[in-house]
Amino acid sequence: MNWDEFLDVNFVEEGEEWKQVTGYEPTEFDSVENLPVYQLAYQFTIDSINLIESRFENKNDESINAFAQSVIIPAAKIAGGFGMGFELEFIGGNIANCKRGLNAANRVLTALQEMRDKKILDQKTFQNFYSRGKEVRDELGIYIVELRERFRRGIP
């Protein structure tokens, strides 16, 4: 078998036949892309990158750099944690990854406040991004609590 056969859609789907035979029904969270907290963080990241590229590409400021460096982390850490899984042996790693994302979300909020204080961001843009960043941070915190509860109860 050549490596390019792995690119064949039919080859990939052959491994999925067992699911149909057993009556397997996928849950809505079989993929990280379907996880609401990830969707929220991912869209915020995309919009933030667009903001940075359109308004701050030629500016060199510590708060802009902190924002740019931190804003990509929450979605990435949620995805990384999801990839570790939800089994009891791995959920601790999932939680740790998400906590790193939570710390980065807090750094995003701090950077946004600094950008507003320095008049780099106008009030309307600040309110939009700060409220969305806070929503990401809060939802990620709730998600971590849910993961901890799952671990505490021994629910895989």
Q: Model segments located where?
A:
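Amphipathic alpha-helical assembly/interaction segments
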Residues: 1-156
